[in-house]
UniProtKB/Swiss-Prot annotation:
GO terms for biological process: isoleucine biosynthetic process; L-valine biosynthetic process. Keywords: 2Fe-2S, Amino-acid biosynthesis, Branched-chain amino acid biosynthesis, Iron, Iron-sulfur, Lyase, Magnesium, Metal-binding. Pathway: Amino-acid biosynthesis; L-isoleucine biosynthesis; L-isoleucine from 2-oxobutanoate: step 3/4; Amino-acid biosynthesis; L-valine biosynthesis; L-valine from pyruvate: step 3/4. This is Dihydroxy-acid dehydratase. [2Fe-2S] cluster binds at residues 119, 185. Pfam families: ILV_EDD_C, ILVD_EDD_N. Signal peptide: none annotated. It comes from Methanothrix thermoacetophila (strain DSM 6194 / JCM 14653 / NBRC 101360 / PT) (Methanosaeta thermophila). The modification N6-carboxylysine is found at residue 121. Homodimer. The active site is at 464 (proton acceptor). Its cofactor is [2Fe-2S] cluster; Mg(2+).
Length: 548
């Protein structure tokens, strides 16, 4: 065992003494040491319950003959960080989480890992650590929140973001009832999208992604994961032996079929890089063209994660997609994906048929995400095309330019933005932000003003997984490094053509050259601290925004 280097032989008597100080017995010292990376904290509804899940995981490890060692990682609530400077810290936390798991696993020479994340950047950070460390690893995501219910309809947090401008008694009702308890926000936003990716990659047990936070099924999956990790250690089945390029392509197809968050196009390449796999944005676009959209989940559709869980979850989606997937890839069950799917039977056949469309009769003929390129985004940009109304798939309009999210909010709320406009929010990229903030507040303000089907928004920042409408993010190169988005001026015409994957600035090249000659990079918004270090080493969003 890898951990023997810390505990075997007479020279390790001091190490054993320290282990015994924590109540570890001689018999336990001979067993596999399993790290349990628990991201529980009291800021994040999706993480408030993770101590219970960790206890179930540890019970499973003990049942199977291992010894669990729990440690913590940080976790930011993107909802609470939204709309102010705190959001700059969310994306940088991804690599800090990854680093912290590496430090604990390597310092203590753990034999295996069970990773327990739930929310937006925390799941990717854990998955990146799995690839970097290449230990036997299982991911147990914390599970979705149940949808709220008020005014005779199901609700989630995005309803509150979109309707706060109305104020009054209805806002108080939404505030009280939209988020009824523990779990990640109830639609297919970034957290749940990434949980689905963990399962689609083969790193979570079947059913894990959609098993809800308050469901006993989640506790059973956690316990079984603890038992299974000991088996993976015995078999030497590490993360890189399970996850391959084919696994990532399977995951991208699932992403397209469920209409996942645009943030998957940022996180999956970053995760792949830690597995020594180059997952280009062009792969997302190619697979999107080949993979129909099968599940119409919030924010683009009517269904919540609870509906998908009742319909059979990620396994049901992969079963539908089986003719398009590589079924030879391994999973943490120790079986191939084909063997796992051969055992799948929907518990609720009616819900399965109603929630998950067929390849022959999909919700949309193409997948959820499109990659746009052109003179405004030479390296690419990302849009959730299945959440865009048909009349806005092709649009041309004048630019209304803002150099920060705060400026854009003032402009939108004061009525500067009119139907037909293209709002441009720049200097919010990985370096420029720094931190590539999610611009949910501006998109929600546009939706709340009834303009989501007549106004487009373009940014070098990101969007929340809860964003809907013609919102194009991750524009690369970003403004802070002199990308074309830095040269846009008010009134410039911008052309959006999602079916043909184009995003163009309709300004003569000679004019752009003159603007480029006079452009100067802005002064950094931060000096010192983690954000300063981050902006100096972060790469383009088109490469996953990883650190170099």
């Amino acid at each position: 065992m890898r951990s023997d280097i810390t505990k075997s032989g007479p020279e390790r008597a001091p190490h054993r003494a320290l282990l015994k100080a924590m109540g570890i017995t001689d018999d336990e010292i001979k067993r596999p040491f399993i790290g349990v990376a628990n991201s529980a904290n009291e800021f994040v509804p999706g993480h408030i319950h993770l101590d219970r899940i960790a206890e179930a995981v540890k019970a499973g490890i003990r049942i199977a003959g291992g010894v669990p060692f729990e440690f913590q990682t940080i976790g930011v609530c993107d909802g609470i960080a939204m709309g102010h400077g705190g959001m700059r810290y969310s994306l940088p936390s991804r690599e800090i989480i990854e680093d912290s798991i590496e430090i604990m696993a390597q310092a203590h020479q753990l034999d295996g890992l069970v990773l327990i994340p739930t929310c937006d950047k925390i799941v990717p950070g854990h998955l990146m650590a799995a690839g970097r460390l290449d230990l036997p690893t299982i991911v147990v995501t914390g599970g979705p929140m149940l949808p709220g219910f008020a005014c005779d309809r199901e609700l989630d947090l995005i309803n509150v973001f979109e309707e706060w401008q109305k104020g009054g008694e209805s806002l108080s009702i939404l505030e009280d009832l939209a988020c009824p308890g523990a779990g990640s926000c109830a639609g297919l936003f970034t957290a749940n999208s990434m949980a689905c990716m963990a399962e689609a990659l083969g790193l979570s047990l079947p059913g894990c992604a959609t098993a809800h936070a308050v469901d006993a099924k989640k506790m059973r999956i956690a316990k079984l994961s603890g038992m299974m990790i000991v088996e993976l250690v015995k078999r030497g089945l590490t993360a890189r032996k399970i996850v391959s390029r084919e696994s990532f392509e399977n995951a991208v197809r699932v992403d397209m079929a469920i209409g996942g968050s645009t943030n998957t196009a940022l996180h999956l390449p970053a995760i792949a890089a830690e597995f020594d796999i180059d997952l280009e944005l062009d792969v997302f676009d190619r697979l999107s063209r080949e993979t129909p959209h099968l599940v119409n989940l919030r924010p683009g559709g009517p269904h919540h994660m609870l509906d998908l869980d009742r319909a059979g979850g990620v396994q049901a989606v992969m079963h539908r997609l089986s003719s398009k997937l590589d079924l030879s890839v391994l999973t943490v069950t120790g079986k191939t994906l084909g063997a796992v799917l051969a055992e799948f039977k929907p518990v609720n056949p009616k819900a399965n048929a109603e929630v998950i469309a067929t390849l022959e009769r999909p919700v949309h003929p193409e997948g959820g995400i499109a990659i746009l390129k052109g003179s405004l985004a030479p390296e690419g940009s990302v849009v959730k095309q299945t959440a865009v109304s048909k009349k806005m798939l092709v649009h041309k309009g004048p630019a209304v330019v803002y150099d920060s999210e705060e400026e854009s909010m003032k402009g939108i709320l004061s009525g500067e933005v009119k139907a037909g406009d293209v709002v441009v929010i720049r200097y919010e990229g990985p370096k420029g932000g720094p931190g590539m903030r999610e611009t949910l507040a501006p998109t929600s303000a546009i939706a709340g003003a009834g303009l989501s089907e007549s106004v487009a928004l373009i940014t070098d920042g990101r969007f929340s997984g809860g964003t809907r409408g013609p919102c194009i993010g991750h524009v690369s190169p970003e403004a802070a490094v002199g990308g074309p988005i830095a040269l846009v001026e008010n009134g410039d015409m911008i052309s959006i053509d999602i079916p043909n994957r184009r995003l163009d600035l309709l300004v003569d090249e000679g004019v752009l050259e003159r603007r480029r000659a006079s452009w100067r990079p802005p002064e950094p918004r931060v000096r010192g601290g983690v954000l300063d270090r981050y902006r100096k080493s972060v790469t383009s969003a088109s490469k996953g925004g990883v650190l170099r």
